Amino acid sequence: MAAKIRQNDEVIVLTGKDKGKRGKVTQVLPNGKVIVEGVKIITKHEKPVPALGKAGGLVKKEAAIDASNIAIFNPKTNKADRVGFRFEDGKKVRFFKSNNEII
């Protein structure tokens, strides 16, 4: 089954404290969550690992956000958009539902 949201897609957050923020998808997780660059920043406490030369402390990183809370961003309309699938030249392609443009 093809995914509507893929790595390197430009997306916009629809709900939550980061509503309206845009960013690139850095990772798509198999449990229906995605990691978006610059969205849902959390602070993790990491222990030092002297054997690896890793210092401990507070580390800021992106946390996973549910895929239902984001939508793909359409640069032509400058809005969130829905994704559809169709076959062109024997290949399955994704397209924006608002203007039928191939992604």
Curated annotation (Swiss-Prot):
One of its GO terms (biological process) is translation. SMART domains: KOW. InterPro entries: KOW (IPR005824), Rib_uL2_dom2 (IPR014722), Ribosomal_uL24 (IPR003256), Ribosomal_uL24_CS (IPR005825), Ribosomal_uL24_KOW (IPR041988), Translation_prot_SH3-like_sf (IPR008991). Keywords: Ribonucleoprotein, Ribosomal protein, RNA-binding, rRNA-binding. It comes from the Bacteria. It holds the Pfam family KOW. One of its GO terms (cellular component) is ribosome. One of its GO terms (molecular function) is rRNA binding. Disulfide bonds: none annotated. PROSITE patterns: RIBOSOMAL_L24. One of two assembly initiator proteins, it binds directly to the 5'-end of the 23S rRNA, where it nucleates assembly of the 50S subunit. Belongs to the universal ribosomal protein uL24 family. Part of the 50S ribosomal subunit. This is Large ribosomal subunit protein uL24. The lineage of its organism: Bacteria, Pseudomonadati, Pseudomonadota, Gammaproteobacteria, Pasteurellales.
